[in-house]
């Protein structure tokens, strides 16, 4: 058995994976193509370069990503340690000096005696234990290799996702359960609109601000993923023949067809999350909350994952990966980072942490670990490998992914505190054996 692991990509996930492997006494060949070849978004040769915001989001345990960070601290995360050491004032968030942060991660990983760095582009997947963590801007050559490995239908180049909501925040008195024409089981929650409600929603939608596209994302709308706001601007009634079509969705309370209907579809196996069908969007997040809360039943909706449209190379993890981040068709191959369908800096690093632990265990001949759904780390791994493979889209950490508490706690902050307490206690117990 080889006593090394190849890690391709020294971003957040790859750097974390390399650290976790190296600290377990296994040699790491870490490949990073920068500065030999840059992506359209990166500017330095440092590991874990943050190309967008300098915030790793909330630190408080009343937020799922705060719980995720705390779990990672208990598992000796290099990324979170570097973030803590290079933090800048940001209220309740963990924000960093991006240059200091990247330098910290680079020094920490590069100087580990078990890590050897190769600054070159990897164009084919090497033999032997390997973690692929090349991120959303994977090079064209490696993308072709991945397409060959996974099958073209399982590799995506754009992330076009509708908002995802907490079911508990939906006003169930204003919606009804029904499938179009009553075909099959009643699988959708339907939000009926009057003409007046539709007009108000339409005007807000076409007036809302969108996120500016980066130059390398300009072709995204030609990929068959039309944003709801672009559709609306093509004509006031365009949406009524598309995602808001009311035909076959008569309201059982009135027996009449609404003027328009917004459908919500279950997004996770537990039924705690719902997505807005056909509402992929490029609106700014604040505008999404304001506009989509005009939909009847969603006035108090909690959005756990905002709609996004951007360049993002990722695989269909429910079809291809195990919750260990291991590739189903090659036991010594692992994936990590945004390529797996986790969304966000911290989530990417967390996936690298698990992939790194498991790659090291694989080399040692030890049983691989699947972290429990009671933890933020484990719930993400479970979600991306078990959700509906036909409608799979990337997801960030949220309490809706964690295993149900088994008791109903109405107060949201108290409920989140209970999720956090259980998650951290679980990680503390598990960490002793990792």
From Swiss-Prot:
Binding site for FAD: 9-14
E.C. no: 2.1.1.74
Cofactor: FAD
Example GO biological process: tRNA wobble uridine modification
Location(s) in or outside the cell: Cytoplasm
SUPFAM superfamilies xref list: FAD/NAD(P)-binding domain (SSF51905)
Protein name: Methylenetetrahydrofolate--tRNA-(uracil-5-)-methyltransferase TrmFO
Protein's gene: trmFO
